[in-house]
């Protein structure tokens, strides 16, 4: 009885104190700050970078390369962290991200920058997935809402500081003899070193190592499946969607998907993404919703800053601040929904409301035009932010709650992985659609009577002709007379910095054409989010657990110890009743030596 009591006392002791949890969260926030700050800095500075490196048309490669590698790396980090612990993998992720940042800061062209951004993505995959997995380890599902404010504060701070820093760097010619925009990447180094120091000092999470094979074949098949499909999404408009190269990409991608499914089935529990997870209807539906919402979320976050800079003439810094309605909407709805979930344990309604608000926001964007004020776009951003705040954490929470404690890491990374797939596809497809539409929409804008009248008036104005700011656009107009509006539209695939400084009458057809092309991608996003809205009604909400993964593991161990002790005591008691001796802890009965001897027959007289 004494032994049983001891086991119970140890198991009921707190796994982590509140102070320890806070220090762990500080370490996680440092890593997440590094990742979120990088995204806001790069996003608002991309136009300046693309103009300087003469490659706006391939800027999608810079974004897509980052998303491809971060997407592929995400489930690998999740599986390896289940095997070797979260801490070493999180440290590796930060280190890789810093190396990629240093290399990106010295890129000489857009292709080189895309390659180094891909290296950054290998680290970012861990920075995005592991904090959520660690939160799943140390906090019960209903308790996590109490700590969401810390992470939202980090996200909000980086969202405000990032555009400001990015705009200052992008607008500076040189800082310490280095091009200003290069500091967009180099600034990660001091921040990353500080984050690494915090993680090394405070991030210590209990871990039980499991001997499971690493699914390298699964990782290889993911690469084979994703890369060609994303390449054709980016290059399809130039190759032709039915060209030989496009068909080859479709075929290789399909074979990769088939190979991945077969590999995961053969690997069983050791799979990169165990297929047993999809036996849960909650996990399966949350995964589908994550893909669709990721498509809309990343598409919006990457295209809206470009729209604000090109059409509304905002600087990179201004475009970052103009995105604040989306960030504020996300914070408000996330905090509110998190507190409600923590108190009630119910979450089914939030994906429904969230996707509905996102759909309303994208529908709002379909009315965008070159003559609409900036505040019009801010209204749509607020709606999208209010929707996102109710969806993202809720879907992750549902995925984590649908699996056992041992699968928290792989479930979290899988949830992030599929959301990243949606985001990667969204960016590649939406940018492809955008630049495919631009030549046609600009050609149509040049046929507008008001635009033609403005061009004619500007062409007869001596001041306009003499102003050096108009030289680039006048040259394009002169060269475009032979090729028509479509050839003029191709000019937006390169340097666009001349548009905001040119005479408004000369720039009007270009800006109107770009705005109309952007409306097309918002219709596409709206269609995708509406599908998510309909599917969200079918998300089965399972009751939230009251214990964290670590507490459940400790409880399971306590139960196992008690069962073993009870079995041993029962065997001892039974042996005592039989007058036998029992070897302690085994439950086996040791019979006296005399009882094992064969009795000798009696001699008859």
Residue ranges and their predicted role:
Residues 81-218, 244, 328:
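Helix-loop-helix hairpins in multi-pass membrane proteins, especially solute transporters
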Residues 86-92, 349-351, 521:
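Juxtamembrane helix-start motifs in multi-pass secondary transporters
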Residues 20-73, 114, 217, 239-410, ...:
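Transmembrane core module of solute transporters
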Residues 1-24, 28, 262, 462-605:
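Transmembrane-helix exit segments and adjacent C-terminal regions of multi-pass membrane proteins
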Residues 128, 145-156, 300, 306, ...:
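Small-residue-rich alpha-helical segments with characteristic i,i+4
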Residues 46, 161-170, 305, 337, ...:
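Small-residue (Gly/Pro/Ala) motifs that create kinks and tight helix-helix packing interfaces
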Residues 171-289, 296, 314, 321, ...:
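Hydrophobic transmembrane-helix bundles of small-molecule transporters
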